[in-house]
Amino acid sequence: GRQYGLGYGHDLKQVGMNVVFSPVSDVNIEPDNPIIGPRSFGSSLPRVSAMINATVGGFLDAGIAPTLKHWPGHGATKEDSHLHLPSVDATLTDAIHLAPFTDNMLTQKNVNGAPIIMSGHLLAKGLDQNRPVSISKIALTNKLKKELGFLGVIVSDALNMRGITSFL
């Protein structure tokens, strides 16, 4: 993880980049997940969180700002958010999917955390019953920033994805 972030980060730096929309921080617990699959570090929470931590450290050491994605976790869905608006079970979100983000994001207690989080286009009913996370003040401001203490930048996944355009 660290060598990946460091090596990839140095390559990006050489061509003038300073931000990367990586690493995928989803715990892929749904075997039929059509979009996360091999992009994830796996289905084990401790492994995923440790690999995210190492990768973030490598990117930061290379001078690249990494992005944790797809908050609050897209690994339990059976739908592709490029095509549909997936939903995530609230208990899974809290118990499994938040940890790779909360363990590795920029906060007052973790000044070496990732400074960017990309929100996923999904309905996380435990956060907001009515709006996808990517356009939810409850999920982004109340939960991510205020409750969890994220101090960095929040970006949205692509706005041409059906997961969000079908909702708007």
Where are these predicted regions, by residue range?
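Glycine-rich, aromatic-flanked loop segments that form ligand/cofactor-binding clefts
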Residues: G1-N28, V48-P72
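Active-site-adjacent helix-turn-beta-strand microarchitecture at beta-sheet edges
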Residues: I36
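Conserved beta-strand positions that form and line the central face of beta-propeller blades
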Residues: S40
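Second-shell residues forming the walls of enzyme active-site clefts
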Residues: S43-L168
